[in-house]
Amino acid sequence: VISPIKEYEKRLAMAEIVDVPFHGKDLLHGNEGYATVSVGDRKRLLTQFARFVRTLPITYFVLQYDATDTHGRDELESKIRRDLASLVYDNLEFFQSFDTISVYYDNGQGAVSVALHDALDFVLAKNVADYRVADYSARRLLQVADYICTVERIAIAYEDGRQSKTHERFFGNRRTFLQSFRKQLLRKRFG
């Protein structure tokens, strides 16, 4: 039996697509590791990565905040802490079924980092969450998290009619995006 990761890597090799660690913003704009990858190959890479995500036994949830509704770091931190603690508490049996919960975060936003620690340590107990440094280039699941964030952000743009030409180039029109990317991902949503 081939693991989903090995299957993904095999499909890329067979299609002669370079295996660049997935990073949505860079893929869409041809930056960083995608600088020498053609638009066509970046589209094929996106399609293969979406297919890979569909095969994974994962679930995800989204905590989303609008800058107009959150005034300052303290308020953002408080909302994240409250919402995350509530989500974990409401699903405590599920979370307690694990001996350890590994939490990967790149510490990109201090408020998020503090809220993650506070909420999880409060609800689960201090020794359950295992905090690790996130390096998306070395971990496929972090790349999956980036893919999920990319699709979720772009879904908002399509819903508001603010999709860009770049979005349409990679994801198609609204209907195609909803069918090929959004709907597939929503099947993995937690709860």
Region locations from a protein language model:
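Phosphate-ester processing/binding pockets and catalytic centers
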Residues: V1-G191
